[in-house]
């Protein structure tokens, strides 16, 4: 995580916590008021609670031109963006997608096209209807990794996030109470 983004979010969160004018606006403020000092994990949690509705920004008397220049939604959005890149699996793909998204999409489309071409050119389908073009086994070979890898990536990202925010192990009693 970028230290300067966290420091700015921490500065603004501490001012907001002292003011508490916006305490009923969204789920960020009850979580904000639960702490007096904010760790990096706390700020990451607050950033991911914020939906960037900007209600607190428009109500705040400490936005520019005030010397505090508060813009909590922007500070939290920057931390949230950085956390998404940090927790993505694989990390290199999370960072690259922000800068080279079109290239990644084109590479993915080209990769799927090559898989379909290879399945059609290398294996005789031998079936009826659509299976005469592409066999069931070829479809499973193509789409099973395309289904499982995102689930695996989400699980890794969620685990990284949960460790960063200091989440406790989830138990069945937590799920019942939710």
Named regions from a protein language model:
Residues 1, 12, 21-26, 56, ...:
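Extended, hydrophobic alpha-helical segments in both membrane/secreted and soluble proteins
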Residues 2-7, 37-38:
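Short helix-capping and inter-helix turn/linker motifs at the boundaries of alpha-helical repeat units
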Residues 6-15:
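Local sequence-structure signature of Cys/Sec-based thiol-disulfide redox active-site neighborhoods
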Residues 13, 34, 38-178:
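Iron-sulfur-cluster electron-transfer modules
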Residues 15-35:
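N-terminal cofactor/phosphate-binding cores enriched in small/glycine residues
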């Amino acid at each position: 995580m970028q230290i300067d983004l966290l420091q700015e979010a921490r500065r603004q969160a501490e001012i907001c916590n002292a003011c508490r004018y916006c305490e009923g606006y969204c789920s960020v403020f009850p979580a904000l008021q639960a702490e007096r000092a904010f760790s990096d994990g706390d700020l990451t949690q607050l950033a991911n609670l914020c939906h960037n509705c900007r209600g607190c920004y428009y109500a705040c008397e400490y936005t520019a031109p005030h010397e505090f220049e508060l813009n909590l939604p922007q500070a939290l959005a920057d931390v949230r963006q950085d956390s998404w890149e940090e927790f993505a699996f694989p990390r290199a793909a999370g960072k690259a997608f922000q800068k080279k998204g079109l290239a990644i999409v084109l590479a993915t489309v080209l990769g799927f096209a090559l898989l379909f071409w290879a399945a059609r050119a290398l294996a005789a389908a031998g079936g009826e209807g659509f299976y005469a073009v592409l066999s069931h086994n070829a479809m499973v070979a193509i789409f099973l990794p395309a289904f499982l890898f995102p689930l695996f990536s989400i699980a890794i990202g969620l685990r990284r996030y949960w460790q960063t925010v200091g989440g406790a192990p989830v138990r069945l009693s937590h799920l019942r109470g939710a």
